[in-house]
A protein has these predicted regions:
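Conserved Rossmann-fold SDR core element
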Residues: 141, 151-165, 211-218
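Substrate-binding pocket helix/loop in short-chain dehydrogenase/reductase
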Residues: 77-78, 82-88, 179, 183
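Catalytic loop of short-chain dehydrogenase/reductase
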Residues: 112-139, 144-152, 164-165
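Conserved NAD(P)H cofactor-binding loop of Rossmann-fold oxidoreductase domains
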Residues: 67-75, 221
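A glycine/serine/threonine-rich, flexible loop-to-helix segment
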Residues: 164-186, 225-228
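C-terminal substrate-recognition "lid" of short-chain dehydrogenase/reductases
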Residues: 192-218, 223
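N-terminal Rossmann NAD(P)H-binding glycine-rich loop of SDR-like oxidoreductase domains
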Residues: 11, 15, 19
Length: 228
């Protein structure tokens, strides 16, 4: 990947892990986050503003890839969800990605680039209290497949659908040993995911030149396996 890779949401969590792994591999990364990052690397240029404020002027003429990592975990009983909840989840997950990709389309096509979006295992596996986020992430999966077809053969577009991953966003769900143990037990591989797990497959998908239109489950076996 000889041109810069745009990573949206590189301050923490999965986005940070991807940005750091790309930099360590020698790739040039342009990171965008709402808040300033607390790390530096010679291959990293960080911009501090919301993804919705991204413009063509912020980008190089050519990109090797775009990673859209922002997300939300808004778990509520269906009867408690308000229209604002659905709109907030859709805005950050689906519309945010849409804006970034519309801005980056020309640079991606110039670089024969790769796009990586993020869904959740809850789209394919029915889970209580996930109605809002599953709807929003389902839209992300549809976006990934549609753009993979529309932008072929110039740009590859893929999506990762993780299960629960140990990130700041998931801190409330993994806030003590009991909760963490319960979460781990739900997975056939008996642990929750790490940002390193997600970053590893993310970088593979960004590099691959013959994978497109796929939603890849990285979920400790939760998506396919039943062990009890």
């Amino acid at each position: 990947m000889q041109h810069p890779i745009l990573v949206i949401g590189h301050r923490q969590g999965i986005g940070r892990a991807i940005a750091e792994q790309l930099c360590q591999a020698g790739h040039t990364v342009l990171g965008v986050s709402r808040e300033a990052v607390d790390y530096q690397h010679s291959h990293l240029t960080s911009l501090t503003f919301a993804a919705e404020d991204l413009t063509v002027e912020h980008l190089p003429e050519t990109l090797s890839g775009v990673v859209y990592a922002p997300g939300s975990i808004n778990l509520k009983p269906f009867k408690s969800l308000k229209p604002a909840d659905f709109l907030a989840d859709f805005h950050i997950n689906a519309l945010g990605a849409t804006h970034v990709l519309q801005v980056a389309e020309k640079a991606l096509k110039a670089g024969q680039g790769s796009v990586l979006l993020f869904s959740t295992v809850a789209v394919s596996q029915g889970m209580p209290f996930h109605a809002s986020i599953a709807m929003a992430k389902g839209a992300v999966e549809g976006l990934a497949r549609s753009l993979a077809a529309e932008w072929a053969p110039h740009v590859r577009v893929n999506c990762i659908a993780p299960s629960l991953t140990d990130t700041p966003l998931a801190a409330k769900l993994l806030g003590n040993e009991a909760r963490a143990a319960t979460a781990a037990e739900r997975h056939p591989l008996k642990r929750v995911g790490t940002v390193a797990d997600i970053a590893e497959i993310s970088c593979t998908l960004l590099r691959s030149t013959w994978i497109s239109g796929e939603v890849i489950g990285v979920n400790g076996g939760m998506g396919r396996l039943r062990t009890a």
